[in-house]
């Protein structure tokens, strides 16, 4: 894994979970 990919995943996963759980 590249650090950039890990960083992007760390940024996007909370947003995706936020949208799915609708707790934004």
Swiss-Prot record:
> Which Cys pairs are S-S linked?
18-24
**Signal peptide (residue range):** none
Which keywords does this chain's UniProt record carry? Amphibian defense peptide, Antibiotic, Antimicrobial, Disulfide bond, Secreted
Tissue-specific expression: Expressed by the skin glands.
Please give the Pfam families that the UniProt record associates with this protein: Antimicrobial_1
Q: Which GO terms describe its cellular component?
A: extracellular region
Question: Which compartments is it annotated to reside in?
Answer: Secreted
Instruction: Indicate the principal place this protein occupies in or around the cell.
Output: secreted
InterPro entries in the cross-refs: Antimicrobial_frog_1 (IPR012520)
Q: Does the keyword Disulfide bond apply?
A: yes
Q: Does the keyword Secreted apply?
A: yes
- What GO biological process terms are annotated to this protein in UniProt? defense response to bacterium
Role noted for this protein:
Antibacterial activity against Gram-positive bacterium S.aureus and Gram-negative bacterium E.coli.
Record family assignment = Belongs to the frog skin active peptide (FSAP) family. Brevinin subfamily.
Its protein name is Brevinin-1Be
What organism does the record attribute this protein to?
Answer: Lithobates berlandieri
- What phylogenetic lineage does the species belong to? Eukaryota, Metazoa, Chordata, Craniata, Vertebrata
């Amino acid at each position: 894994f590249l650090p950039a990919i890990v960083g992007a995943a760390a940024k996007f996963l909370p947003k995706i979970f936020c949208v799915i759980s609708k707790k934004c």
